Structures are given as C-alpha cells and as structure tokens.
C-alpha cells in the first residue's frame, strides 16, 4: 500500500483549499469530495487503492470544513451549488489539471455534479453517491412529504442563527444524532 496522504494547500480566487494527495504526480487525476458531516478521512480506505492503481488522488476539505479558508474577510460565505462547483474547478486550476475524474457523496456529490454540468470539458468522469445531484431550487419552495421533512430537520435548523450556535456549541452531539437517524 502507498503512504498516507501528504497535505498541501492550493490557492484559488476565493479559497485556500487544504487537500491531501497520494499516488504518482503524473497519475490520472481523481478528486474525492466528502459530504457533511464528514471530511477527507471518509476516504481513508479508498485512497491507497486508487493510488496503487496509478491515480493521482486529491482529497480536499470543502469550503466550511477543516483548515480550508476563505482568502478574504469580505468574501460572501455561500453554500450555493454554483459556488461549490466553482470551488472544484478552482482547485483543478490551482493544481494545473486540465480535467479529472470527480467522485463525491452528499455535498461532495453535489459539487461534482455541478462542476460536471457547468464545465463538462474539465470532467473526465463522474461518480456521485447519496448526493443531492443538481438541486431544483424552485422545487425547494414547496414542502416534501412529512417523513422526508422529518429526515431533513437539520437542514432547516442550519438555516438559522440558533442552528449555527447549536453546531458551534455541541458539534459532536449534533453529528451523533445525525448518524443515528
């Protein structure tokens, strides 16, 4: 098996993206994009397999996660899907990659799908699991079935100051509750 991830930081127009990398520098590039509430460690077991197969594996912390930071204090903080897709393309630019395979789940899957839809020439392949794919924003204006609304309770909470405080004050307990459902 190859060695664990080497950590780096890539500077884009908006972010200083911290990422792990494994495999040969000249290998076929694959970007692994994590979801919430996970981080790059969600890919611990798959990274060595891909690296041993000759891939240049890049695993970034998405915006709002880990040590990835906005470069400027006045940059609007956004979770809009276009911004997430642009983050992926910004990382490809910073790494001087013409294209890469994108693989992600949850928010990472959304980021990958948006990047593939808006910049198809930059995406050599796409794998998205348990993600939101591309969100029909207009559809979000209407209620879902009550059982789905119940399952998505945390998304409503996170839209409020109360939710921000809940996440800041007791992140572990909140994540434990999410994993139990």
Spans of features found by a protein language model:
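Flexible "cap/lid" subdomain of the alpha/beta-hydrolase fold that forms the substrate-access gate
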Residues: 2-6, 17, 29, 65-103, ...
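N-terminal carbohydrate-binding accessory modules
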Residues: 9
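Glycine-centered tight beta-turn/hairpin loop motif at sheet-sheet or coil-to-beta transitions
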Residues: 12-16
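Conserved HGGG/HGGXW glycine-rich cap/lid loop of the alpha/beta-hydrolase fold
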Residues: 18-73
């Amino acid at each position: 098996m190859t060695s664990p991830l080497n950590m780096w930081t890539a500077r884009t127009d908006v972010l200083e993206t911290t990422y792990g990398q494994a495999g040969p520098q000249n290998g076929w590039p694959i970007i692994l994009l994590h979801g919430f509430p996970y981080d790059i460690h969600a890919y611990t077991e798959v990274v060595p397999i891909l690296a041993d197969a000759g891939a240049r594996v890049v695993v970034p912390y998405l915006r709002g996660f880990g040590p990835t930071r906005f470069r400027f204090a006045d940059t609007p903080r956004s979770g809009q899907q276009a911004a997430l897709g642009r983050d992926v393309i910004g990382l490809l630019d910073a790494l001087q990659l013409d294209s890469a395979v994108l693989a992600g789940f949850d928010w990472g899957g959304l980021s990958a799908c948006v990047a593939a839809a808006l910049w198809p020439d930059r995406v050599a392949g796409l794998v998205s699991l348990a993600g939101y794919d591309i969100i029909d924003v207009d559809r979000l204006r209407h209620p879902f079935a009550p059982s789905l609304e119940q399952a998505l309770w945390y998304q409503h909470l996170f839209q409020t100051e109360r939710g921000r405080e809940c996440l800041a004050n007791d992140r572990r307990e909140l994540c434990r509750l999410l994993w139990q459902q």
